Amino acid sequence: MRFKTKIKLGAAAIVGGAIAGVALNKTLDAMVQTHLSRDGITHPKQKLMSKKNQEDMANSPETILGQLFAASTPQINITIPNREGRHINALLYKQSEHSTKYAIVVHGYRSSVKAVSYLARRYFENGFNVLIPYLRAHYGSDYDYCTMGWYERFDIIDWINHIDSTVSGANIVLHGVSMGAATVMMVTGESLPTCVKCAVEDCGYTSVYDAYCYKIPKMMGLPVFAVDLFRHAIKKRIGFDIKEASALNQVRKSCTPTLFLHGDSDTVVPSSMARELYNNARCEKDILIFPDADHVMSPLSNSDKYWNKVWEFADKYLDK
């Protein structure tokens, strides 16, 4: 092969590699936009849950009662500055008579404050004021990107501090579902005021990285190693590391009593994650696995069993 020919082939390889690199970066950036941007979250291109799971959720009596509760109960929209100087928003259901009991209910990924009305109703009917924050990049938030609980944990702590500073003798229960559950666990790994009495996590994941390793290959037909490329794209675009975004590491530091709830038939976040989280938590803890429940379905298909466990657990720690 002549020298000039070798040079041409080498140059072609370099150009081809550069083009492939540009194409890969565009693909990864598109994935970030699809999964974590405001537009990707509010206008999803792919479904996380099966059609049956969605229909079961919509038709559950608990869901319907929650919708009726939201439509008939006075609500207050609250805005406070967070530690970044940005405005964060929440919906508050406030008891007509004075109550120091507060439930901070944290919604899931691609969900909303209204979608967790079935949780809000139960707490409100049990005498709690209920605060439901709008999570980053979801409807009602000013943020452009979601961090799957990692930076959201600081917003929840800012809400906790707001309640602590405005309500004398506040008793706070944290209750999150799916991404909201991971957020709650991430919160409990931080230093919290004594007004936080306990936490309830329902079908949360061990880490954002683990959640993506489980779901992205199934959703997009990609190999698991693609998650590492996605990880670096997220870090470049948004500035957080999905491996560091670990509920597992946070519960290892937690002093907040935590109840772990999960459906054993969960197709989005495997129940093995709940067992791993429970086994690693250093706080006072309890766990209940619902044998036939899919993702977020435990309180909808097993409502009596679910809430009996929640009240049994919370009553141990709330001030009498």
Protein language model features and the residues they cover:
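An N-terminal hydrophobic leader/cap segment in hydrolases
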Residues: 11-81
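Alpha/beta-hydrolase active-site loop
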Residues: 146-167
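Conserved alpha/beta-hydrolase
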Residues: 120-142
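Hydrolase active-site cap/lid region
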Residues: 186-240, 249
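Catalytic histidine-centered segment of alpha/beta-hydrolase-like enzymes
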Residues: 293-307
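Short beta-strand/loop motif that positions the catalytic acidic residue
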Residues: 253-255, 260-262, 266
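Short amphipathic, positively biased membrane-proximal segments
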Residues: 1-35, 47-48, 124-126, 164-165, ...
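Catalytic histidine neighborhood in serine/cysteine hydrolases
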Residues: 278-296
